[in-house]
């Protein structure tokens, strides 16, 4: 805030009004309505000019200094708001609520809405296929309460999480646009690296206040019905969210009707690294192309796409729910029923967000037109669902229902193609309201009335030169030439004298004038009133309509998964109780879509006897693809989808871990190796015998000894944890693990050389790889020929003089004997080299003693 507001009395009346409002919102940009523009002043103007690339100018003076100013037309504000919200800014909308014609001094203004990244609901400001979440967290290092609100749909949830690691992983999954934290938390916390973190007063998270406000919001006496009455921290976070939402929206929130208690134990847990490595809905470059979501999403509605993304990011461990989804997909595939439903679903639109905007009372005419069309489409959709026999689909059909009365009302009320906003009218149909029709008729038919009046008056008076007209100053009038003015009837009242003419008005014309001049403004006011009444009536039906929207979104996702199963050759997986993961002819669902050649499918078999596969083979041979496809097949199975495999049998997993790829964390001061070890530590601490673990090239980034030792010990630990593990490595020494760990087996990706060039076969075969083909891969990558040849010479010498590939067998816990890396076995020690150069006959006793001490220090 600048010092310009220090003494309000020094400012002009208009700027005094501005500063009184601005003081309430010092950290937010204020859009201050002035006529047809939103103006920004002082620091806000400078900031907005830089962010939006708009002109910074100055407006007169106030308090003795020029006022920095920038403005945008109010009718194009949405585009600018979208850019600011995307940049993480919050904007205060300050509107004129007084009538300029009757105001003495500045027109009265007030803040009508605050737009923040986590509370936007306007269609133009949202990504239609992504959730836009507001989150709040409170607690200490041991236990956190987290609440999440999607104000654009009405979903509201709470959960409690143990430890920073779990909290940060959950925030990575949710990716909230805005995160509220207590102001008394220490500065520089890891989560503050996120965009959109806002600090709130500690008392905003008070549990007792939150409990009261939540009960009031849901019209309940307690929170037992939501299963969260004992979640003290989470309730505090939810109370903070509710207060913040009300503060920004400046209206009631009737579309927030319940609170969902989410439990980590119900889901497959993926940490942030695993989520990124698997590229579920964001690729490693930060885009959306070539992700699992991009391949699996052919949903007909935006709300269906958002639900599918939530499923992909939150796989389930509830076998009953998963098999109900599988049964639904099977049913939709029979007789290609999904093909009939999908075009009908397309007519539904984004019902979820339309209903939220109705609840927030900022729904636009086209929202109501889309709701009208959606409700009109429901009877035909229900007819298409009559043949569906899957119990879950029958339940969805019941929840969807039909709304003939609402559909009829909206069909009578809203014109076919309404304008974008209600401001200028023209939204409601003729015949919907008699008073509105009369006012609109007066406004629209004034010209015809005046022509008819002129004809009648000429006939009544016999004055052929009589004219009926209008001007803005004197309104409607009857004009007669001065010579005929004396012949005017008695009911003509003189209104104006002109050179050569007199103007009159009659009681009939005066009555019409009173109606006509106010008809347009009265028609607009009447239409706005009727529109608001229509919104209030729809708000009374929000609960069943929101239930219908949720069921329609799920039907869309299931129909989409049926379509994907047919067109991508996906098959139904089978869940079993006995721990196992068996995949026949599995494929990577994303890679096979971008390959120009057929994808090479592979089998995988893990069970109680074989818990780990050590995977060897050349770079580019397909090890990472094989590992990732396994994780994606499991993940798809545990959202209830069919999977890219000829057959799949699996037990439910509790976590999916991945240690794949290399990346540093420069901002966090962590090297590539440190990041790798942190991810490895997380896996070793948290994996269970129900987890799926993917480990790729553990130990690279440090010395050969250190890397091999760490990889070996990590593999042994995972074998003892009995987690289902795919362990890819270039350390061939690890291929002896099956001899000491019975639950470990070797497999390799096949390749061959032809004319000194490598050919990747991509088949997974039993046993370890025979060689790494590193030089062939380097040649394929374009390494210069002379470098390749020199490398062959070095390799030949090393292979001739190195120790054979074998490693001692150790029981768990047994200390490791000294081991020498075969890679450096042929290189003599520098001390030995120096000793070889010394002639003992040329050294004095003193020199020999000094040399001995020197050599000893170098060992």
From Swiss-Prot:
<dbReference type="GO" id="GO:0003684">
    <property type="term" value="F:damaged DNA binding"/>
</dbReference>
<dbReference type="Pfam" id="PF05192">
    <property type="entry name" value="MutS_III"/>
</dbReference>
<keyword id="KW-0227">DNA damage</keyword>
<dbReference type="GO" id="GO:0030983">
    <property type="term" value="F:mismatched DNA binding"/>
</dbReference>
<protein>
    <recommendedName>
        <fullName>DNA mismatch repair protein MutS</fullName>
    </recommendedName>
</protein>
<dbReference type="InterPro" id="IPR007860">
    <property type="entry name" value="DNA_mmatch_repair_MutS_con_dom"/>
</dbReference>
<dbReference type="GO" id="GO:0140664">
    <property type="term" value="F:ATP-dependent DNA damage sensor activity"/>
</dbReference>
<dbReference type="Pfam" id="PF05188">
    <property type="entry name" value="MutS_II"/>
</dbReference>
<dbReference type="InterPro" id="IPR017261">
    <property type="entry name" value="DNA_mismatch_repair_MutS/MSH"/>
</dbReference>
<dbReference type="InterPro" id="IPR007696">
    <property type="entry name" value="DNA_mismatch_repair_MutS_core"/>
</dbReference>
<dbReference type="InterPro" id="IPR036678">
    <property type="entry name" value="MutS_con_dom_sf"/>
</dbReference>
<dbReference type="Pfam" id="PF00488">
    <property type="entry name" value="MutS_V"/>
</dbReference>
<comment type="similarity">
    <text>Belongs to the DNA mismatch repair MutS family.</text>
</comment>
<keyword id="KW-0547">Nucleotide-binding</keyword>
<dbReference type="InterPro" id="IPR016151">
    <property type="entry name" value="DNA_mismatch_repair_MutS_N"/>
</dbReference>
<dbReference type="InterPro" id="IPR000432">
    <property type="entry name" value="DNA_mismatch_repair_MutS_C"/>
</dbReference>
<keyword id="KW-0238">DNA-binding</keyword>
<dbReference type="GO" id="GO:0005524">
    <property type="term" value="F:ATP binding"/>
</dbReference>
<feature type="binding site">
    <location>
        <begin position="617"/>
        <end position="624"/>
    </location>
    <ligand>
        <name>ATP</name>
    </ligand>
</feature>
<dbReference type="InterPro" id="IPR027417">
    <property type="entry name" value="P-loop_NTPase"/>
</dbReference>
<keyword id="KW-0234">DNA repair</keyword>
<keyword id="KW-0067">ATP-binding</keyword>
<dbReference type="Pfam" id="PF01624">
    <property type="entry name" value="MutS_I"/>
</dbReference>
<dbReference type="InterPro" id="IPR007861">
    <property type="entry name" value="DNA_mismatch_repair_MutS_clamp"/>
</dbReference>
<dbReference type="InterPro" id="IPR045076">
    <property type="entry name" value="MutS"/>
</dbReference>
<dbReference type="GO" id="GO:0006298">
    <property type="term" value="P:mismatch repair"/>
</dbReference>
<dbReference type="GO" id="GO:0005829">
    <property type="term" value="C:cytosol"/>
</dbReference>
<dbReference type="InterPro" id="IPR007695">
    <property type="entry name" value="DNA_mismatch_repair_MutS-lik_N"/>
</dbReference>
<dbReference type="InterPro" id="IPR036187">
    <property type="entry name" value="DNA_mismatch_repair_MutS_sf"/>
</dbReference>
<comment type="function">
    <text>This protein is involved in the repair of mismatches in DNA. It is possible that it carries out the mismatch recognition step. This protein has a weak ATPase activity.</text>
</comment>
<dbReference type="InterPro" id="IPR005748">
    <property type="entry name" value="DNA_mismatch_repair_MutS"/>
</dbReference>
<dbReference type="Pfam" id="PF05190">
    <property type="entry name" value="MutS_IV"/>
</dbReference>
């Amino acid at each position: 805030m600048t010092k310009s507001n220090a003494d309000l009395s020094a400012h002009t009346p208009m700027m005094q009004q501005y500063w009184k409002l601005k003081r309430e919102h010092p950290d937010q940009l204020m859009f201050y309505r002035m006529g047809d523009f939103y103006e920004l002043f002082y620091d806000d103007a400078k900031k907005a000019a830089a962010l939006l690339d708009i002109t910074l100018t100055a407006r007169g003076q106030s308090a003795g200094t020029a006022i920095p100013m920038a403005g945008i037309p109010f009718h194009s504000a949405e585009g600018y708001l979208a850019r600011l919200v995307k940049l993480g800014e919050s904007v205060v909308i300050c509107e004129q609520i007084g009538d300029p014609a009757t105001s003495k001094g500045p027109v009265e203004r007030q803040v009508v809405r605050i737009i923040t990244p986590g509370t936007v609901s306007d269609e133009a400001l949202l990504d239609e296929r992504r959730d836009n979440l507001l989150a709040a967290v409170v607690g200490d290092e041991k236990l956190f309460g987290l609440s999440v609100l999607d104000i654009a749909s009405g979903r509201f949830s709470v959960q409690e999480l143990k430890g920073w690691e779990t909290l940060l992983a959950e925030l990575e999954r949710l990716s909230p646009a805005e995160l509220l934290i207590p102001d008394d938390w220490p500065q520089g916390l890891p989560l503050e690296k996120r965009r959109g973190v806002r600090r709130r007063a500690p008392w905003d998270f008070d549990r007792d206040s939150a409990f009261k406000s939540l009960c009031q919001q849901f019209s309940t006496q307690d929170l037992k019905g939501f299963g969260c009455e004992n979640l003290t921290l989470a309730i505090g976070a939810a109370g903070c969210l509710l207060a913040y939402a009300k503060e920004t929206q400046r209206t009631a929130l009737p579309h927030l009707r319940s609170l969902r208690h989410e439990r980590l134990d119900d889901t497959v847990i993926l940490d942030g690294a695993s989520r990124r490595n698997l590229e579920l809905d964001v690729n490693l470059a930060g885009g959306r192309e070539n992700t699992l979501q991009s391949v699996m999403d052919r949903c007909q509605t935006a709300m269906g796409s958002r639900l599918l993304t939530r499923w992909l990011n939150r796989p389930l461990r509830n076998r009953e729910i998963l098999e109900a989804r599988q049964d639904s997909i099977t049913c939709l595939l029979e007789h290609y029923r999904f093909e009939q439903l999908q075009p009908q679903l397309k007519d539904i639109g984004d019902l979820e967000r339309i209903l939220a905007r109705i609840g927030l009372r900022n729904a636009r005419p086209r929202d109501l037109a889309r709701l009208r069309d959606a409700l009109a489409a429901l009877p035909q959709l229900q007819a298409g669902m009559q043949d569906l026999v899957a119990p879950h689909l029958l339940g969805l059909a019941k929840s969807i229902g039909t709304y003939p009365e609402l559909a009829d009302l909206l069909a009578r009320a809203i014109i076919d193609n309404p304008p974008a906003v209600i401001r200028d009218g023209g939204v409601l149909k003729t015949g919907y309201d008699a008073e509105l029709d009369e006012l609109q008729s007066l406004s629209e038919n004034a010209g015809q009335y005046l022509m008819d009046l002129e004809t009648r008056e000429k006939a009544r008076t016999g004055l052929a030169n009589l004219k009926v007209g209008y001007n803005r100053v004197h309104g409607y009038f009857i004009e007669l030439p001065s010579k005929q003015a004396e012949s005017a009837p008695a009911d003509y009242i003189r209104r104006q004298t002109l050179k050569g003419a007199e103007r009159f008005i009659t009681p009939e014309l005066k009555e019409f004038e009173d109606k006509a001049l106010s008809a347009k403004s009265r028609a607009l006011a009447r239409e706005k009133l009727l529109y608001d009444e229509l919104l209030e009536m729809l708000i009374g039906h929000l609960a069943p309509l929101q239930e219908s929207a949720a069921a329609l979104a799920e039907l869309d996702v299931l129909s989409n998964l049926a379509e994907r199963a047919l067109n991508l050759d996906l098959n139904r997986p089978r869940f079993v109780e006995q721990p196992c993961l068996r995949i026949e002819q599995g494929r990577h669902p994303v890679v096979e879509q971008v390959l120009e050649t057929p994808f090479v499918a592979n089998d995988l078999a893990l069970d109680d006897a074989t818990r780990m596969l050590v995977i060897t083979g050349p770079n580019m041979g397909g090890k990472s693809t094989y590992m990732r496809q396994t994780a994606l097949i499991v993940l798809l199975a545990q959202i209830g989808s069919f999977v890219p495999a000829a057959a799949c049998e699996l037990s439910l997993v509790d976590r999916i871990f991945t240690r794949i790829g290399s990346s540093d964390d420069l901002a966090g001061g962590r090297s590539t190796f440190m990041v790798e070890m942190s991810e490895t530590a997380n896996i070793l601490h948290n994996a269970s015998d129900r987890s799926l673990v993917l480990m790729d090239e553990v130990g690279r980034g440090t010395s050969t000894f250190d890397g091999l030792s760490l990889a070996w010990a990590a593999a042994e630990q995972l074998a003892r944890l009995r987690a289902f593990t795919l362990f890819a490595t270039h350390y061939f020494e690890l291929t002896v693990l099956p001899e000491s760990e019975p639950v470990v087996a070797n497999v390799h990706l096949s390749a061959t050389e032809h004319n000194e060039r490598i050919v990747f076969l991509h088949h997974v075969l039993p046993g370890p790889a025979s060689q790494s083909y590193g030089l062939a891969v380097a040649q394929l990558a374009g390494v210069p020929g002379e470098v390749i040849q020199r490398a062959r010479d070095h390799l030949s010498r090393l292979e001739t003089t190195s120790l054979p590939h074998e490693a001692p067998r150790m029981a768990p816990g047994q200390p490791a004997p000294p081991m020498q890396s075969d890679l450096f076995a042929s290189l003599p020690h520098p001390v030995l080299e120096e000793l070889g150069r010394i002639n003992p006959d040329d050294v004095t006793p003193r020199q020999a003693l000094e040399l001995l001490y020197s050599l000893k220090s170098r060992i």
